[in-house]
């Protein structure tokens, strides 16, 4: 029985990892535009970084819901390191959106925690 439950649970993983969701605000910002905003230090850079910080906050909130779970990813992530991480990601993945970068960052941060 335990083996059946485990197989069922593992079969759900790809569905969770590829879930579609509505992206609002700066998450629709394409990576080349983020890199340009970084180079010019425009207001769009700050709104983009704030959007990603909110995304991380939302993930932490969602993770904390089950019975007061203490899941705080990105605890040591500074705004300066976030700006650099996003630029590196966007340079390597110019076809992606800021939301894709945020998702990749969450995966990386979860692996570290």
Q: What are these language model-derived features?
A:
Residues 7-14:
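Bacterial N-terminal signal peptides
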Residues 22-88:
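Short N-proximal segments of mature Sec-exported proteins
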């Amino acid at each position: 029985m335990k083996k059946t439950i485990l197989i069922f649970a593992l079969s759900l993983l790809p569905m969770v990892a590829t879930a579609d969701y509505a992206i609002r605000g700066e998450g629709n910002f394409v990576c080349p535009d983020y890199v340009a905003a970084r180079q010019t230090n425009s207001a769009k850079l700050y709104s983009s970084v704030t959007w990603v910080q909110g995304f991380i906050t939302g993930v932490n909130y969602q993770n904390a819901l089950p019975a007061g779970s203490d899941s705080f990813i990105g605890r040591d992530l500074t705004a300066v390191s976030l700006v650099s991480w996003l630029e590196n990601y966007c340079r390597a993945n110019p076809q992606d959106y800021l939301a894709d970068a945020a998702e990749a960052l969450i995966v990386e941060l979860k692996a570290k925690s």
